[in-house]
Amino acid sequence: MGTGYRMIVGAILCMALGLAGCASMGGSTGTGFSYKNITVADGSAMAGDGRTVLYQGNPLGLSGTAIKTGDRLREVQLTQTDLSLVGITETKGKGKVRIISVVPSLDTPVCEQQTHYLSEKNKGLDKMIELVTVSVDTPFAQKRFSQEAKIANVTFLSDYRDAEFGKAYGLYLKGPHILARAVMVVDANNTVRYLQITPELTHLPDLEEAFTVAKSLITAG
């Protein structure tokens, strides 16, 4: 299957993923973004070869080396919005607690809400830690999204080149060429202290739990 075909399939699937969870409207934050009533995932899938996540009940196979709580971050190169490369362990928040939010595509409503929530509802954590979003969107698309959404407190990193991040962490969905939906909290020593991979792609991760874990790491430090 060619790369172009995979990207087309991925775009079609991503649109479906985004629309599936967004039937009922929620309230507005006053920032211009209207939150929707999207299910928050209960529990976590497991990463890596042989594991699956669901899309509307249908399994999609994960690819790559599994990551789990207690593992150290594996160094991979990602592309920043200025097209420069950076290692995932060498971002501007190096030496700090970080929340890494992983989304299939920012051009879908579920991913959009996940990213707004990370940016707007982190309870002041953005002043103390680094917030990161990783997706296979191009750096140009990520930059456009951040500007249009007026999100300046999140570091956007693109895995578009060869899904190196997805494969290194067992979060790569090879068929549609996207990443599974996940959130991880990483301590100052690059150890994963919290990881949730949503079992159903149309559900949001529990960012409130991620915020709680991040705050506890700051307090303990």
Kindly give the residue locations of the regions a language model identified.
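Short active-site neighborhood of thiol/selenol oxidoreductases, capturing the structured segment around
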Residues: 87-118, 130
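Short, acidic, Ser/Thr-enriched surface-loop or helix-capping motifs
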Residues: 80-82, 186-187
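N-terminal targeting signals for export/organelle localization
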Residues: 2-79
